[in-house]
């Protein structure tokens, strides 16, 4: 997650950071900023200048845990991105 963010331009990181902070301090939220993906997974929908970023997360013991981020290219969340987020969620839960 951190590497993905660091690879983005500064102004895009700022937009995503503001959206993550909004979710952190105003949870629970719904559309248009946050959408439920099922399996206790959620996505933050960040509108960048000419593309859309998604940050997948879950809530554990009152904390928001960021799992995966990507630039969205289709209307539907790609299966491989969702699977990676679920894998990271399960790994996190095993160690906590």
Language model features with spans:
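Basic, Lys/Arg-enriched alpha-helical interface segments
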Residues: 2-52, 60-64, 71-96
């Amino acid at each position: 997650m951190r590497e993905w963010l660091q690879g983005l331009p500064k102004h895009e990181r700022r937009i995503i950071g503001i959206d993550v902070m909004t979710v952190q301090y105003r949870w629970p939220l719904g559309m248009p900023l946050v959408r439920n993906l099922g399996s206790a997974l959620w996505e933050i929908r960040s509108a960048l200048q000419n593309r859309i970023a998604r940050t997948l997360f879950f809530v554990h013991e009152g904390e928001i845990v960021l799992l995966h981020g990507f630039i969205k290219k289709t209307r539907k969340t790609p299966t491989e991105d969702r699977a990676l987020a679920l894998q990271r969620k399960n790994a996190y839960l095993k160690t906590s």
